[in-house]
């Protein structure tokens, strides 16, 4: 009989940075005290307490209870087949970011008026007249966006003065930054003629003093 534990894991992963250590402890406590399901102390990932066991993962316990079945149906439609690694990242690993868009934006899709208000507050302007669609794990046609393999964890489509606009969202479960890759640095910070530079300068969201400067001086 397989050994399991219903308690929070006492183990600390030595490779965790401060934020991830706090997040791992939080998720282990959430699994123990809210989901009330065990973890596998012998699993290479599960022994730290923030990784659901197969039956619990397949039941969708990584997803919001009130919208769980809808989320599972939408995931099945979006991903008819998942590799074992992809499945674990989305269904079992409570520290990955893959589940977050489904847990946040599926509920928001049930009240698009409230969603518009939330994003107008985030943007600090009455930019959004009406949210018309919320797409999760969506990739636009290359030539209509950044001319690469860019995909969005979530894409918010909305109307502004009768014009269709969009907000692309990348979701990360972290408070720490990610370094530029070689291609990203070249396209975002060095090539003034890149599609990234053109979109940045033409989007209208930067004041003139910034948008008129070389892209390498403005990229974060």
Question: Where on the chain are the PLM-derived regions?
Answer:
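Hydrophobic/aromatic-lined pockets within catalytic cores
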Residues: 109-113, 159, 173, 177
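Extracellular structured ligand-interaction cores
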Residues: 99-101, 149-153, 164-168
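Nuclease-adjacent, charged terminal/linker segments that flank catalytic cores
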Residues: 1-144
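A Trp-anchored, charged/polar loop motif used as the substrate-binding/catalytic surface
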Residues: 145-157, 209-220
